[in-house]
């Protein structure tokens, strides 16, 4: 069988991570999500927390510009991007898999056997879900959703020059709030 890769990009709270894991389980292939962060930690020596958070900040943002300046060379975020690119490319070359987030849709854009999926849902569905799944209590769920989506979009735009969530950048976009998690899994698995 030819290697097949499914990338899952998603709005925060839409269930994309859960969908990716369920698709992988149903197909009997690995799902890479936190494993990408772990591999980047091994390669760079940065802490897991830093690697995870840096994936949501673009160089030149307030936080990163306080610590580095691109005029003097690549930022830590740039270094992490290079490692992320390498790790995702290597995972896709290993064999069939599902890769969740981390701009994998862009990184693997030239891979002919890659299905690029975007999962989204309306604000109410996502707000309820982050309270149920993550126990969100510190700020309003809607505020956290807007913040996370804004960061993901900026990061994606900075490194890929593509508009995150824009339907034309994906083979398939699914509304998990309307279809439900399990139906999204069935649809994606049927296209494998």
Where do the model's predicted regions map?
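Conserved phosphate-donor/acceptor-positioning beta-strand/loop module used by diverse small-molecule
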Residues: 110-132, 138-148
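Short beta-strand-centered segment that lines the nucleotide-binding/catalytic pocket of NTP-utilizing
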Residues: 30-41
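RNA pseudouridine synthases
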Residues: 91, 104-110
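Glycine-rich phosphate-binding P-loop
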Residues: 8-24
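ATP-dependent small-molecule kinase phosphotransfer cores
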Residues: 41-96
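Small-molecule kinase domains that catalyze NTP-dependent phosphoryl transfer to phosphate-bearing small molecules
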Residues: 59-66, 78, 137-182
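Pre-Walker A (Motif I) flank of P-loop NTPase domains
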Residues: 2-11, 95
